[in-house]
Amino acid sequence: MCGIVGIIGSGPAAAKIVEALKRLEYRGYDSAGVATLEDGKLARRRAQGKLRNLEERLAKEPLNGPLGIGHTRWATHGKPTENNAHPHASDKLAVVHNGIIENFRELRDELRGKGHNFVSETDTEVVAHLVTEEMRGGKGPADAVKAALPRLRGAFALAFVFDGHPNLLIGARQGAPLAVGFGEGEMFLGSDALALAPFTSDIAYLEDGDWVVLTRDDADFRNAAGAKVSRPRLKSQASAFLVDKGNHRHFMAKEIHEQPEVVGRTLAHYLDMSSGAVRLPFELPFDPKALTRITITACGTAYYAGLVAKYWFEKFARLPVEIDVASEFRYREAPLPEGGLMIVVSQSGETADTLACLRYAKENGQRTLAVVNVPTSTIARESDVAAPTLAGPEIGVASTKAFTCQLSVLACLAIALGRARGALDAAREAELVSELIAVPGLLAEVVKSTAATEKLAATLAKARDVLYLGRGTAYPLALEGALKLKEISYIHAEGYAAGELKHGPIALIDEEMPVIVIAPSDPVLEKTVSNMQEVAARGGRVILISDDHAVHEAAINLEAHLPMPAMSPDFAAIVYAAPIQLLAYYTAVHMGKDVDQPRNLAKSVTVE
């Protein structure tokens, strides 16, 4: 969602703030702004649209103060206009905010009754005036923030600077991430470590309810009660040099092509390739034999990774699996069994709905395991055990390499649990590990052979609607393929289990409808072929993603075939993810869309 940066140091802060905000562009945004303190006085510059618009504004109207805050906004309350852009200010302070203040209308009405004037449509402006009201009552900045925070309902991260206080930067967190960076004679606030990587790798994270008072040389952490607390200082693994497209046109293209490397790196972290066994890089805090059920919750693409994993856990570990989207599960008050394990999947480790599910599971006596790409994230810290993906920072809003790395980790977990529970013997484990070892090479073969995909994309770009079909682990890929196409090309697409075709979707089939069938050579290929023939019989345009064997079995005229190498079906889902990503990518590029920052989308959804 929104990105927050704060800097207190000795040199001009605005340029550094903009540099840090560029590293948060991947979160998605529609406006940006900076506020600094120069000679003790607040000044703001804001702009609608991309950061380059803010840079142009700053070039004409520079800010030179050594203390400042910056923000990239993703609209939740109020349209994406300059007037609604952060920082918001009163006569005493400026504030930036990530999250949602749920009771802002109630607070706004109260503050209006006390003479406060509001000039924006946002919930954030209420925070500025609420703290200002406390200061008008005689409190200093820190005490005013302390008094205001308990009155705010919702999830938020905040950063404040105060008129007349040139050595003071205050941050607060409730439900949305916020990190403190430690420098030499300067201190930093940021939504994540990636934003602060050019300046420091020495990081501490606020916990829920925390607020922190920063000066150039010190960080004073306080909990919700105002008591002094310590938070561990960690060495961030984020690099100042990671945000780079290399020789690719878009981050998404780069990240698709990085998959052979990062999937290989992730698998190497979990597999003993010489012995043909899974070696988890952590101790499981439970007895696998005592598990009674697995519950998986996640959002978006991570949910589809969990849906693939359901097949693996049931097949290899012989465990029943329930999976639900986190935004639904968290409100269901679902009964959870004794001996249950909750697995949550999140690229950022900060997804609000997924975090709520994790906390619900812990409150109800479940063991918890998190598959995350950010090992220092809130979800990683709060779970019983974190299973890291080694995808590296993913900048494109549409997830690609994080998805295949999530699948890789979940596959290893399924094998490990199956072996520990006696559902797999050593020979079968070695066979499955051998299949996983082959995955990076198969991915490399797919991502370097894009001619057929690029040609098909030019045709697909003219479609109004697209249908994706699959069975088994290819069914979640059909859902993911439809999501990818919707996300970045804005073409309406739907994914279905191929066996459900006759239960409704077949009514949509005509000569205008492209039907993309994901069909590895697996035990249900014959059934999938019958579905393709049903589509062809009704004039539908069948596009097959599979190997040559499936083409031969289909025995129909295909509009297009995206060729895949022959492989074992067990983990074909990891490899078959690449062509659906590439097809969405090239279609969107052909249409001239903003692939890395599609409209209305955010990378890390830290609000409900």
Spans of model-derived segments:
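Active-site phosphate/pyrophosphate-binding segments
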Residues: 259-263, 267-295, 364, 385-514, ...
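Glycine-rich oxoanion-binding loops at beta->alpha junctions
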Residues: 49, 66-83, 274-286, 309-345, ...
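Buried hydrophobic positions in well-ordered alpha/beta secondary-structure cores of metabolic enzymes
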Residues: 2, 28, 69, 99, ...
